[in-house]
Amino acid sequence: MPRPALAFALAVGAIAVAGAAQARITEIRIDAVAPFAEGHSFGEVGSYLRITGVAKGELDPFSPQNKMIVDLDKAPRNARGMVEYEVDIFVLRPADPARGNGLLFYEVLNRGNKQIGQRLHDFVGSEAASQNDARTRAHAGNGFLFERGYTVVWSGWDPDVAKGNATMGAGLPVAMEDGRPLARRVREEIQVGKRRSADVEAVRLSYPAASTDRSRAQLTVRARASDPRVVVPPQEWEFADARSIRLLPRGTRFTPISIYELWYEATEPKVLGIGFAATRDLVSFLRYERADDRGTANPLAEAGGGVRHAVAFGGSQSGRYLRHFIELGMNKDAQARRVFEGMFAHTAGAGKVFANHSFGQPGRTFTQHEDHDYPENWFPFSTAYTLDKLSGKTGALFRGDGFDPLLIETNTSTEYWQKGASLLTTDPAGARDLSLPESSRVYLIAGTQHGGRAGLDSRPGACANPTNPMSPGPALRALVVALEQWVTKGIAPPPSRVPSISAGTAVEYADVRMPPVKGLALPHGGNLIGPPVDWINPPGARTEIRETQGEPFYG
């Protein structure tokens, strides 16, 4: 080889190595490989294998590819100056990959839980562990994805998911400052009787307390988000330990449904935004690499067939995760390759996830009663480019950089009342309809509710009215097929079908009238979507503004 050519080759090699070092999976550890569904044959695809293990990766904290990750510069580094992490992985793939359809179907975990069994496969098991530890023929439900030949992948992204029930998590580093874990004053909202049991004496905090000195903390309570906060006297509560508080005298229970808030000095925050990079880099590895640094084969490439396309699916928190993933530019990997060609976000409304923030709390979600003052709904909302007068910003969820996925978003009636779903197709002021890009579709699955799935009954649970038992499953399955054809064949799905201002089907909540029905509780109004207030240092001057002067809201 002539010297100029050799020099050029070496330079290109150096660039490739540098690019690979920015963000990548370094090790795949396979813990178990076993037949899935007791060896059942799914049509022409045949039987499936169940693969579990751990993926380890590393990130360059100074790479432009990772610059959007909050506090990554504060994470400990290895000898190469890289930030390390690891995530649980779970794969269901055709035993003979050549008989699969070449599509990787990545489901984003919801608080560490798998959900496609209930959302797509009509699995009616009541215990989360039943679908989280999918093994048997019953766990395959109707077999929809398997009969179509998908390779299904899950991986952890949240380091603080509840343990047990076979949940999947992530090992992420703690943010450090001056050689010690970062510490800040944070606001913790506490409510029992809905998302957590009311029969508890002590409640767990999202982060350990840097100090359990009550003189440096404050606990308040109110019945509703719109009520003024009432301070709980210091002698009426205490830190049970660094990670929990309880009321005094001992044995006193928190009032169910009431909103308690604790302002305290917290510490040991994980660098949560790494979870997004872990998804990006794992799927990129499974699509494009043959083996890890130790020579362990890519479990999707070792037997032939391989992955030609990748799509992602998520419902509720997981759907918001996908919207946030797009906004952060995570669909472009370190080698400038697209990660997912298609995405499907269900019941995400207009929100994202409180997960790329200092002292973030990914499990928070803005609903009718609680978690109103945490980051979830921030501009941009729509894939269409528009102006937000509240923030003074212009923009769109899509980045327009050539790496945006084909996107399908579906919502139910719940998300229009509680999650700002109209903001996907109207401007932030709610004044006009938007024209969405050709690569974006939005649908309302009318007559269904946020947690709709097969096997629901109408018992009210924590709600005032009976639960809507209607399942959106048939519509979701049809749209999965539509996304598949869009990605693989270029066949576009039907046009978006949503309420619109121009047609008079999208109206102010105050204009929606329903006659009184005996025994039926009617909503007092819409769940207004406003910009998030501060949750750290201090508790937020705008919190006081909201209580005394009102707050601007999105249309």
Show where each model-derived region lies:
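C-terminal His-loop and adjacent cap/lid subdomain of alpha/beta-hydrolase
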Residues: 24-555
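Positively charged n-region of N-terminal signal peptides that target proteins for export
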Residues: 1-7
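N-terminal signal peptide c-region/cleavage motif recognized by signal peptidases
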Residues: 18-20
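Bacterial N-terminal signal peptides
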Residues: 7-16
